[in-house]
A protein has these predicted regions:
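Conserved Class I SAM-dependent methyltransferase catalytic core
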Residues: 14, 21, 27-43, 214, ...
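Conserved S-adenosyl-L-methionine
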Residues: 200-312, 317-327, 332-338, 348, ...
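Flexible, glycine-/basic-rich loop-and-beta segments that form/coincide
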Residues: 403-481, 485-498
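Hydrophobic alpha-helical scaffolding
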Residues: 154, 175, 231, 257-261, ...
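Conserved nucleotide-binding/hydrolysis micro-motifs of P-loop NTPases
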Residues: 41, 262-263, 290-291, 315-318, ...
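Short secondary-structure junction motifs
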Residues: 29, 250-252, 279-281, 360, ...
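Non-catalytic, mostly N-terminal accessory regions of nucleic-acid modification and defense proteins
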Residues: 1-223, 283-289, 396-399, 428-429, ...
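Hydrophobic alpha-helix feature that most strongly marks membrane-spanning transmembrane helices
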Residues: 246, 273, 277, 315, ...
Length: 859
């Protein structure tokens, strides 16, 4: 049967769908506190019961039996049992306040909302006596169960909270945490709520792709045993850094953070704990970072704690940040000899982080571009930082990455151990993104390009530059990126002579370096010289075909196909063999690097495009599939199925029902395509016939609605009507049938009504055939899962994972060539109309108008 595991994508979808269904009209930022808070309480309850199970070695008991046993043990050995649970967990929850007891009360029809309030209050009381109560204190302070946003009366609020409680009821939070699925789901929900919250999201969330840039910058710079985020938000930056460390480093990592907003501070602690961070490994404080310098070294109270990594996405250009009247006597600012202006707190956050950075550490902070060029006190601070050799890199990111602001931002990287004379890496990544709805997003390839450029310190035209101290001094310590990296010029200037007399200027062919290097002779053969130095393309279509079939392209295409086949063969065997011991993150990283190397020897292709193809394969298929395979084995997982649940009805009749089964790994339509092709072809043929008939019927409906048409008088009365007697876009079959019976064959209208009747009848019959054949094919597919051979599984899974990869990567080879051919076509069109031809056209039009005027007769 195999082990049915809930995958990361499945739990994310389930929880987010549930959130949207349950929250009603409550705004995202409000509902987030309730959903994430109760989800965390379920985690605490599951951990409590899991500790009881481990302590008593009750591994075979169901959850209900375990709850009953816990109640008995707790009542019998109360103080002793509290100690047994609290010691390893840092807290305890009495049985009457467990999440499982809430569900029991719900199922038995005696749930009251007060039990949730009592449970949360009891948790606060019990942890107050802990040695380190800060770990859990006031975690649920944002959950106001009397808030009328939950419902205007107690019954409505109780009903809404019960629905939310039920959403998490069957999730084993302990098992999900061990596989990181729980933490990932929690982080996903935070991100989704952030997008829904819009501007308010800036208080607690850094977009995942921005977190990745900062995390990979610091993680690739050296060993990390401690990490600090002075504007910690939800804690996502700390956790993203963790994911890029070795397993051993993750276990030993110490987390530090400070957050001013209390609700967000609670979110941080929950997020860290759900990601498996032990309470003793995290120190998070609810306070104003700039007003209250923290943390201090407890053994040396007058010295700052320093960390291996500092990451931060602080509020941008925070006004009036210095309400406490801080001065240069504050050691965070004294070493640069200038106070950041009260009107913008950007450098205040930067200097705070730098003050707490260890001598061998790396800091990465997200800031608005103004810090790179603004003058006054900020200019003095920037000069001091450059002279002291602290700034290691400046990375310009695209605009509109954040939900709370559209301004472009940059990442400033700082170190205290840079070599003397080492240049500053300046990267302009502002043009590398993909637009998703209204937001811009960095893709995997964009992040990889940034990190490789930074770590390898590569200079790339229009992308990166290594700026020396002398060069920066010549620019008056201005680090504005366009001073060092010239933007890509895509616009080709217009040539006056070309417009006047026609022809593409010879120098414009220098802007087509790819086709002029790989197919220069082919291009020249398709050009005719209009006059000296100006050309036109004879036939752009045949030129494109010949260039794409040129010997160079064909050779590279064949070589690339061989590379792809080798790549696929290698990873096909690796992916089939994953197990619970496989580190999927490491496997993904190696596979992506190998994909990038596919184009290493082809100079005109961006090798990161192949990187993205494989990254999308992981996002869309491999991540989920490999989680399932790792819990079973390849061939066992491949024949596993699950109920296909669909929502039917609406309103009070809305319900969820099973509609057959679907494969856990192998999609049903793949089995149809490869193993039941005849049946599928038959269905496709039916569908094509149906589409044709419905098009024909649609044309009749249109003329039946048109009062001026010949068919109106015959067909209009046969259309369906709504309650207001307005015609619908459909015929009433009963009316058509009745009309046909009343007409005789000699009537003028008979053929038209008969045609309508025949169309409706044929559509009805084809729909029945489709329904019957669809049901029959579905049943064959359901049964076929159990009898799939290893060879069939190999065929199906290979096509799922790699069926389109040769074509997808092959397109990358041709894309730059096609782009230049499009430019050539545009240039040919641009200079096709000369001044002489335009004058001639005007003259001809004037003559035509003159002739028409002569024919006008005044009556």
């Amino acid at each position: 049967m195999g082990i049915h595991v809930i995958t990361s994508d499945e739990i994310k979808k389930r929880l987010w769908d549930g959130a949207n269904e349950l929250r009603g009209s409550m705004n995202a930022s409000q509902y987030m506190d309730y959903m994430l808070g109760l989800m965390f309480y379920k985690f605490l309850s599951d951990k409590t019961l899991d500790q009881v199970r481990a302590t008593e070695m009750l591994h075979d008991l169901t959850e209900a039996e375990l709850l009953e046993r816990y109640e008995k043990l707790y009542n019998e050995y109360q103080e002793k049992y509290i100690k047994l649970i609290r010691q390893p967990l840092g807290y305890y929850i009495p049985p009457e306040y467990l999440y499982q007891r809430w569900m029991k009360d719900i199922n038995e029809g005696r749930f009251e909302l007060q039990i949730v309030t009592d449970s949360l209050n009891n948790f606060e009381r019990t942890i107050a006596s802990n040695q380190n109560p800060d770990d859990f204190e006031n975690l649920f302070s944002s959950l106001d169960l009397t808030n009328q946003a939950l419902g205007k009366d107690l019954n409505t609020r109780s009903k809404n909270i019960k629905s939310l409680i039920a959403l998490f009821a069957d999730l084993n939070m302990v098992a999900l945490q061990k596989s990181d699925i729980l933490g990932d789901a929690y982080e996903y929900l935070i991100g989704m709520f952030a997008m829904e919250s819009g501007k308010k999201a800036g208080e607690f969330y850094t977009p995942r792709q921005v977190s990745e840039v900062l995390a990979q910058v610091v993680a690739t710079s050296g060993p990390i045993a401690s990490i600090y985020d002075p504007a910690v938000g939800s804690g996502s930056l700390l956790l993203t850094v963790k994911q890029h460390l070795s397993q051993q480093a993750q276990k030993e990592l110490m987390y530090y953070g400070q957050e001013k907003n209390t609700a967000t501070y609670n979110l941080t602690r929950m997020n860290l704990l759900l990601h498996g961070v032990r309470p003793e490994k995290m120190t998070v404080r609810n306070a104003d970072t700039l007003a209250q310098d923290w943390p201090e070294d407890p053994e040396r109270p007058n010295e700052a704690c320093q960390f291996d990594a500092v990451v931060m996405n602080p509020p941008y250009s925070l006004k009036n940040w210095n309400s406490e009247g801080l001065t240069l006597s504050d050691p965070r600012f004294s070493f640069v000899g200038a106070m950041p202006p009260d009107s913008a707190g950007d450098y205040a956050f930067l200097l705070h982080g730098l003050y707490h950075l260890g001598q061998q550490g790396t800091m990465a902070i997200v800031l608005p571009h103004g810090v790179l060029f603004r003058g006054g006190a900020e200019g003095a601070i920037r000069k001091r930082l450059i002279d002291k050799n602290y700034i290691d890199a400046v990375i310009g990111l695209p605009s509109n990455l954040f939900t709370n602001t559209g301004i472009p931002v940059c990442v400033v990287v700082l170190k205290k151990n840079r070599s003397l004379g080492e240049p500053i890496v300046i990267i302009d990544a502002s043009q590398y993104f993909v637009k998703v709805k209204t937001q811009n997003m960095l893709q995997d390839k964009d992040i990889a390009r940034i990190i490789e450029t930074y770590t390898s310190r590569i200079e790339t035209e229009s992308y990166s530059h290594l700026a020396s101290l002398g060069e920066i001094k010549r620019n008056d310590y201005n680090l504005n990126i366009p001073r060092y990296v010239e933007p890509i010029k895509t616009e080709i200037p217009h040539h006056v002579d070309g417009h006047l007399y026609g022809g593409i200027p010879k120098e414009d062919f220098n802007r087509l370096p790819i086709i002029m290097s790989i197919a220069q002779d082919i291009v020249k053969n398709h050009l005719s010289e209009v006059r000296e130095g100006f050309y036109k393309v004879k036939a752009i279509g045949s030129l494109q075909a010949e260039v794409l079939q040129s010997p160079t392209i064909e050779t590279e295409r064949k070589t690339l196909e061989d590379y792809i086949n080798t790549f696929v063969e290698k990873y096909w065997n690796i992916l089939k063999s994953v197990s619970s011991e496989t580190n999927l993150a490491d496997l993904k990283a190696v596979m992506l690097d190998d994909a990038k190397n596919l184009f290493a020897d082809i100079p005109w292709v961006d090798s990161y495009e192949a990187y993205q193809v494989v990254a999308e394969l992981w996002h869309q298929k491999l991540t989920t599939d490999l989680e399932i395979i790792a819990a079973n084995d390849f061939y066992t997982a491949a024949i596993m199925t699950e109920p296909h649940m669909v929502t039917k009805g609406s309103g009070k009749t809305k319900r969820v029902e099973q509609d057959g089964v679907i494969g856990r790994l192998i999609p049903n339509d793949l089995i149809e395509h490869f193993l039941f092709s005849e049946e599928r072809d038959k269905l496709d043929s039916y569908q094509a016939d149906l589409d044709s008939l419905e098009t024909e019927l649609g044309e009749l409906i249109e003329v039946a609605k048109e009062e001026t048409s010949d068919e109106y008088n015959t067909l209009n009365d046969l259309l369906k009507r709504d309650d207001n007697d307005e015609v619908k876009d459909a015929f009433d079959a009963a009316h058509v049938n009745k009309a046909l019976k009343e007409l005789v064959k000699t009537d003028e209208s008979f053929e038209l009504v008969k045609k309508t009747y025949d169309l409706l009848d044929r559509i009805k019959k084809i729909n029945k055939s489709i329904k019957d054949d669809r049901k029959s094919l579905d049943e064959k597919v359901y049964a076929r899962f159990e009898t799939l051979t290893h060879e069939e599984i190999d065929q199906l899974m290979w096509n799922k994972w790699f069926g389109t990869i040769t074509n997808d990567i092959g397109k990358i080879l041709e894309a730059p060539v096609l782009k230049e051919l499009d430019i050539l076509s545009m240039l040919n069109e641009r200079y096709s109309d000369t001044l002489q031809s335009i004058d001639l056209e005007i003259s001809n039009l004037e003559k035509s108008l003159e002739e028409m005027m002569k024919e006008l007769v005044l009556e």
